[in-house]
Design a protein with these regions (language model features):
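Short, polar N-cap/turn motifs at the start of nucleic acid-interacting alpha helices
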Residues: 109-117, 183-185, 204-227, 247-260
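Short basic/aromatic active-site micro-motif
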Residues: 83-89, 164, 183-202
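Basic, Lys/Arg- and aromatic-enriched nucleic-acid-binding interface segment
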Residues: 10-23, 33, 37-105, 114, ...
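Active-site/catalytic core of tyrosine-dependent DNA strand-transfer enzymes
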Residues: 4, 58-63, 70, 115, ...
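Short alpha-helical segment immediately N-terminal to, or the first helix within
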Residues: 92-93, 198-199, 212, 228
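Short, basic/aromatic-rich helical patch in the C-terminal catalytic core of site-specific tyrosine
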Residues: 1, 24, 28, 103, ...
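Alpha-helix C-terminal capping/helix-coil junction sites
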Residues: 32, 93-94, 178, 200
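C-terminal secondary-structure termini that scaffold catalytic or DNA-interacting sites
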Residues: 67-75, 125, 145-154, 159-165, ...
Length: 263
């Protein structure tokens, strides 16, 4: 057991170390419960301290990731490690800062093309509350392209073959890009954190960023309904500013700092 865990330690993976240790301990405990073993050799091994990730992509990494996804989406990169539909969904994550699980379970009924809003039902959000996401023209274009690329008109927007979900493949997409030498040492969630950090650097207050990310604190039902709609305009301004900033990075134009409006 120590030899196994030492190999993980040498790789600098404390989270993996703790997960493997817990799994091994459960296996031995099961053996004791079945009277196959008389002791658990993993029981006295201490956990490794875990630090929350604070990884944020640099402008160069962000631009590089976008260019890779764009090449895959448009079919100009030979033998891509992920599908064009996965690349399209990841680009929407970069445009909207929403969780991958929410993007890849998006259904056509959740999207209002006319008003430019994506409504994520509480059954799909992490905090269980309905979340309204403003869609910029660039974000809507990705969704429209998915429709013309064989997805819809019913069911999932970013669907695989025969309309099947890509949620599981999406969890591994950034890792596949990294193993192919097309992405750096970052995760899908780091991409979302990068957008949040970018909004902060553009001058938006934490309250607006929290509502963009759907991380606002819970409260009375009336308060939650008020907050959800009260921040629609702020969320729209924030994601439009982020879209301009992202486009500026992609095209080599520096964005100016935004001074958010106040009501």
């Amino acid at each position: 057991v120590h030899e196994l865990l030492d190999r993980i330690t040498d790789r600098g993976k404390p989270v993996t170390y703790n997960r493997v240790k817990a799994l091994v301990s459960r296996i031995f405990k099961h053996g004791i419960d079945r009277e196959w073993l008389d002791h658990n050799p993993a029981a006295g091994i201490p956990k490794k301290p875990e630090r929350s990730r604070e990884r944020v992509l640099t402008d160069e990494e962000l631009t590089g990731l976008w260019e890779v996804l764009e090449a895959i989406r448009t079919g100009t990169r030979p033998t891509p490690p992920i599908s064009s539909m996965l690349a399209r969904g990841l680009q929407l994550m970069l445009r909207t800062a929403q969780r991958g699980g929410e993007v890849f379970t998006m259904e056509w009924g959740d999207v209002d093309d006319a008003s430019g809003w994506w409504t994520i039902p509480g059954t799909k959000t992490k905090n269980g509350t309905t979340h309204r996401v403003p869609l910029t023209q660039a974000a809507l274009a990705l969704i429209t392209e998915a429709r013309t690329d064989g997805s819809g008109p019913d069911g999932l927007v970013f669907a695989g073959r025969e309309g099947r979900t890509l949620e599981w493949q999406a969890k591994k997409a950034v890792s596949k890009l990294r193993h192919a030498g097309l992405a750096g040492d970052y995760t899908r969630h780091d991409v979302r954190r990068t957008v949040a950090t970018g909004l902060e650097e553009l001058g938006f207050p934490t309250s607006t960023i929290a509502h963009v990310l759907n991380q606002q604190e819970g409260g009375p039902r009336a308060t939650k309904i008020y907050a959800r709609h009260h921040f629609d305009q702020e969320k729209t301004v924030a994601l439009e500013a982020w879209g301009r900033h992202l486009d500026g990075l992609i095209h080599g134009v520096t964005s100016a700092r935004v001074v958010p409006f106040r009501q």
